[in-house]
């Protein structure tokens, strides 16, 4: 993590938290607090005037992917018991109103999911209804490419679907088990995982 841009800070934080959790599961203590706390402080101070993040410092050039990555890292830190003083007050997402002006992107799913985890006010149901057909359209394009070229391995957008299904299940109390079932696989030890 040579450059200490926001992406590298968040990635380092995730790595340190995962290492700490792993060592604790083995019953060993590890001293990473001195490394974790300054990263949390730095990331929270790098929040820009839009209450999100860019690649460097607190630049106004907001990156939604970057913001989602940082929000996930800070949520992991908070869940691990670290104080995270994050200013999301007044951040309200009006995705249905802004989408016509900027189009739809896959990173929208990641930022909506991250904001949902932080309980930011938004009409998540409408956003999911807009994004699910978008993902299906991308899948159809991939299938079309696969039909034309037998060596082409199409993307299934499983990650994006799982994020949308999680929001849908929590916000609309919709059972998404039937949607997930085709992706469930078992390993040699009967452990369950998702794969496309």
Stretches with model-predicted labels:
Residues 1-196:
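Large, well-folded core regions of big proteins
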């Amino acid at each position: 993590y040579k450059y200490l841009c926001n992406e590298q800070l968040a990635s380092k934080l995730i790595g340190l938290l995962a290492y700490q959790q792993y060592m604790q599961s083995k019953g060993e203590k590890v001293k990473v607090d001195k490394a974790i706390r300054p990263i949390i402080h730095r990331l929270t101070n790098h929040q820009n005037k839009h209450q999100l993040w860019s690649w460097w410092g607190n630049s106004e050039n907001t990156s939604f992917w970057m913001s989602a990555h940082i929000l996930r890292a800070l949520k992991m830190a908070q869940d691990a018991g670290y104080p995270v003083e994050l200013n999301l007050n007044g951040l309200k997402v009006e995705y249905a109103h802004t989408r016509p002006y900027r189009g739809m992107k896959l990173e929208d799913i990641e930022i909506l999911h991250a904001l949902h985890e932080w309980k930011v006010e938004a009409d998540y149901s409408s956003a999911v209804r807009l994004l699910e057909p978008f993902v299906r359209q991308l899948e159809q394009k991939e299938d079309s490419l696969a039909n034309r070229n037998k060596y082409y391995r199409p993307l299934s957008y499983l990650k994006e679907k799982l994020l949308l299904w999680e929001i849908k299940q929590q916000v609309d109390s919709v059972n998404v088990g039937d949607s997930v079932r085709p992706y469930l696989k078992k390993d040699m030890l009967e452990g369950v995982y998702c794969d496309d």
